[in-house]
């Protein structure tokens, strides 16, 4: 099912970007 795979890939990418932004904001706030 290519639709399910593409949806899962998009969800994984969104989660990764959110985690990176969250960690980046925490580091900036720490400094």
Swiss-Prot record:
Keywords: Chloroplast, Electron transport, Membrane, Photosynthesis, Plastid, Thylakoid, Transmembrane, Transmembrane helix, Transport
GO cellular component: chloroplast thylakoid membrane; cytochrome b6f complex
Subcellular localization: Plastid, Chloroplast thylakoid membrane
GO molecular function, one term: electron transporter, transferring electrons within cytochrome b6/f complex of photosystem II activity
Pfam families referenced in this protein's UniProt entry, alphabetically: PetL
Mode of membrane association: Single-pass membrane protein
Transmembrane regions: 4-24
Record InterPro entries: Cyt_b6/f_cplx_su6
GO biological process, alphabetically ordered: photosynthesis
Coiled coil (UniProt feature): none
Protein family: Belongs to the PetL family.
PANTHER family registered for this protein in UniProt: CYTOCHROME B6-F COMPLEX SUBUNIT 6 (PTHR37266:SF1)
Described function: Component of the cytochrome b6-f complex, which mediates electron transfer between photosystem II (PSII) and photosystem I (PSI), cyclic electron flow around PSI, and state transitions. PetL is important for photoautotrophic growth as well as for electron transfer efficiency and stability of the cytochrome b6-f complex.
Subunit and partners: The 4 large subunits of the cytochrome b6-f complex are cytochrome b6, subunit IV (17 kDa polypeptide, PetD), cytochrome f and the Rieske protein, while the 4 small subunits are PetG, PetL, PetM and PetN. The complex functions as a dimer.
Name of this chain's protein: Cytochrome b6-f complex subunit 6
UniProt organism field: Silene latifolia
